[in-house]
Amino acid sequence: MALNTSAEAPLPVGEVSRLIGGWIDRLGAIWVEGQITQLSRRPGAGVVFLTLRDPSHDISVSVTCFRQVFDRIADVVTEGARVVVLAKPEWYAPRGQLSLRATDIRPVGIGELLVRLEQLKKSLAAEGLFALDRKKPLPFLPQLVGLVCGRASAAERDVLENARRRWPAVRFEVRNTAVQGVNAVAQVVQAVEELDALQEVDVIVVARGGGSVEDLLPFSDEQLIRTVAACRTPVVSAIGHEPDSPLLDLVADLRASTPTDAAKKVVPDVGEELERVQQLRDRALRTVRGLLDREERGLAHALGRPAMERPHRLVDEREAEVDALLGRARRVLGHLLDRADSELSHTLARVVSLSPAATLERGYAVLQRPDGHVVRSPEEAGAPGEPLRARVSEGEFTVRVDG
């Protein structure tokens, strides 16, 4: 029901609190699931106080119940346990605080947990979070390895010692977190996000040395699975629990059976790599020697041929052939030049004999009128007294027509 309010007609805080309490009262009793993060049982008190938390969304709510309700499950429930409670929501108006009053509390059994994990597994698989094509390859030689593990844990020691034994120069960026219990999910998620944000981190290892199914529940939490799926950095899961692998094993880019196995898969062994380099050098040396031996045999075979016993003989034979060809060329060229010279002399003699200069040398003269016209007959000589130019072999002179 919408409330008709305005800045001029607001509702008092008490009225708002009363209305909220009325809405909550109409909810009735509901079943709620969560993880017990705080448990307070005061001696002599008839009421037990609990805090239920949803680890996937980091939301908590206070729960109260009568001691006789809690005593029925007190031996099997501790902080960190998952329970379902039948409770009536209550609104405490003076403080504006919501709480639950439980009338029944039941621990969540391992069988039920496994069923829920299987359902979550199928749901995430349907989204493609476990697909092989999403897996990122690990670098051959990471310069900086991010490690998420419990403080001073065997898992931390196994990863650090084995990795440094294999490759002493490897460096680690370690984030110590809770690896079980109510705070594990939030701390592991934060650590993974911090390491993924560091550009120099080449690979992230999330390690824990095994444990019960209940202890490993944080590593199947949906929030953590989605965080790992969103990482740009390759992630290695090293939880170390073979029968029932947590969902982290499926979303990680590589699964290691134990923290020690993770160290072996993350960094190469310096001894093995040196041996591999030596093997490659030996193989290259054998290949080069084989090539040299083959070329030496080929050279020896070539030198053993008859032509190579007296190599100058081929040159001498070709030199004689060249000399013969040069002599022949000189003779042919000389003959051609002599014939050309004879033909040129003959042609020159004919040209000279046909030249007007030869006629003039025999005493003849050529008469030309002043306009250059050659006189070929007496009629062309012109009138008496007209000058003519006479050309002879040694020059020319002027004459005049006489009658």
UniProtKB/Swiss-Prot annotation:
GO terms for cellular component: cytoplasm; exodeoxyribonuclease VII complex. It comes from the Bacteria. It catalyses: Exonucleolytic cleavage in either 5'- to 3'- or 3'- to 5'-direction to yield nucleoside 5'-phosphates. InterPro entries: Exonuc_VII_L, Exonuc_VII_lsu_C, OB-fold_nuc-bd_dom. Its main location: cytoplasm. Its EC number is 3.1.11.6. It is found in: Cytoplasm. GO terms for biological process: DNA catabolic process. Transmembrane segments: none annotated. This is Exodeoxyribonuclease 7 large subunit.
